[in-house]
């Protein structure tokens, strides 16, 4: 499941004229850290806060051909200007891709560049033969959730307190987030659960999310 060539991503999630994707390089780490800090200050704590540390990129992220690493960071560029960032993480054992965090420069948000995040995550997953892709969406505003739903991702639940955010200067709170997934393999690759193996509450939720898929046995 090698990482794809970033040039091929433009076919799956095309950008407006004048914009392009690039893979993060070692020399761009400081600029990327500063961009996240400026565009998404809430991640100074919590699950995505690693993206504000330069050592995270040097040790964990694909850089200059180090394709064995499990984090992949895509830059959005206009000419020489950095205008957006998307970070994803692969789980080789389960063959799943997690859309970790993305951010767009406020000066370029009118072009709806973040609309490409779900498509990019899916394109990466398909090109690598992943079974599923997933990501989390904030419940503070509806925009990211709307993008996932528009592109056919499924809402499978609300996670309480999985992550923390700085909601205002000096105030850190645990947050609720929506979890969205998209399955990339055929139905035949699944072992369907037996209804007799589920509690009534589990069965009710399963039927709500995946109607007619539980085994009657």
Model-derived features: where do they sit?
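A short beta-loop-alpha structural element at the N-terminal edge
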Residues: 18-34
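Conserved catalytic-core motifs of GNAT/GCN5-like acyltransferases
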Residues: 136, 149-171
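Conserved GNAT acetyl-CoA-binding A-motif
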Residues: 125-138
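Conserved glycine-rich acetyl-CoA-binding loop
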Residues: 81, 105-116, 128, 141
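Short acidic N-proximal helix/loop "leader" segments that mark the beginning
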Residues: 1-16
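C-terminal "cap" of GNAT-fold acetyltransferases
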Residues: 163-210
């Amino acid at each position: 499941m090698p990482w794809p060539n970033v040039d091929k991503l433009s076919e799956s999630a095309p950008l407006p004229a004048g914009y392009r994707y690039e893979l993060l390089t070692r020399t761009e780490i400081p600029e990327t850290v500063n961009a996240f800090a400026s565009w998404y200050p809430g991640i100074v704590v919590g699950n995505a806060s690693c993206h504000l540390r330069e050592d995270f990129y040097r040790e964990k992220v694909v850089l200059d051909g180090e394709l064995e690493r499990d984090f992949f960071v895509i830059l959005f560029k206009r000419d020489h200007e950095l205008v957006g960032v998307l970070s994803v993480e692969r789980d080789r054992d389960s063959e799943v891709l997690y859309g970790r965090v993305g951010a767009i420069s406020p000066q370029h948000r009118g072009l709806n560049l973040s609309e490409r995040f779900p498509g990019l995550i899916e394109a990466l997953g398909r090109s690598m033969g992943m079974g599923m892709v997933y990501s989390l969406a904030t419940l503070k505003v509806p925009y990211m959730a709307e993008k996932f739903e528009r592109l056919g991702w499924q809402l499978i639940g609300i996670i309480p307190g999985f992550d923390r955010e700085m909601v205002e200067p000096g105030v850190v709170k645990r947050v609720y987030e929506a979890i969205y997934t998209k399955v990339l393999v055929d139905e035949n690759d699944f072992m369907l659960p037996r209804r007799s193996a589920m509690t009534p509450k589990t069965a009710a939720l399963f039927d709500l999310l995946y109607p007619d898929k539980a085994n009657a046995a």
